[in-house]
């Protein structure tokens, strides 16, 4: 099974940027310790601070699915549900 790359774009509401950032940062430590997590990096757009992007690499889809079932991920979803304008998640496989 191929490794899985995730690019997830989260857009915070303008009045919630710092709260969303705080919740996103809480994910880093526990997620990087998860089985199958190869890379889990958070970025913030230089021109629009309300835009955050995760670049993730997972051993496989099962590892990603387990991450999404974790308590820390569920806590994040509950905490930011009303604070974000939207999210776009791309699940990709490296081809070169």
Region roles according to the model:
Residues 2, 41-48, 77-96:
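Glycine-rich beta-strand-turn "strand-cap" elements at beta-sheet edges
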Residues 4-32:
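N-terminal first-folded block
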Residues 7, 17-20, 51-53, 62, ...:
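Extended aliphatic helical segments
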Residues 4-10, 41-68:
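Short, well-ordered beta-strand segments in beta-rich or mixed alpha/beta enzyme
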Residues 16, 40-41:
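A broad "ordered helical/assembly scaffold" signature
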């Amino acid at each position: 099974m191929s490794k899985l790359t995730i690019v997830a774009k989260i857009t915070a509401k303008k009045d919630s940027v710092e709260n969303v950032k705080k919740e996103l940062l809480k994910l880093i430590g526990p997620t990087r310790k998860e089985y199958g997590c190869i890379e889990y990096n958070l970025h913030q757009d230089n021109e629009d601070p309300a835009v955050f992007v995760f670049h993730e690499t997972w051993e496989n889809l099962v590892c990603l699915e387990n991450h999404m079932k974790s308590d820390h991920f569920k806590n994040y979803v509950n905490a930011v549900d009303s604070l974000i304008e939207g999210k776009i998640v791309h699940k990709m496989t490296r081809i070169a």
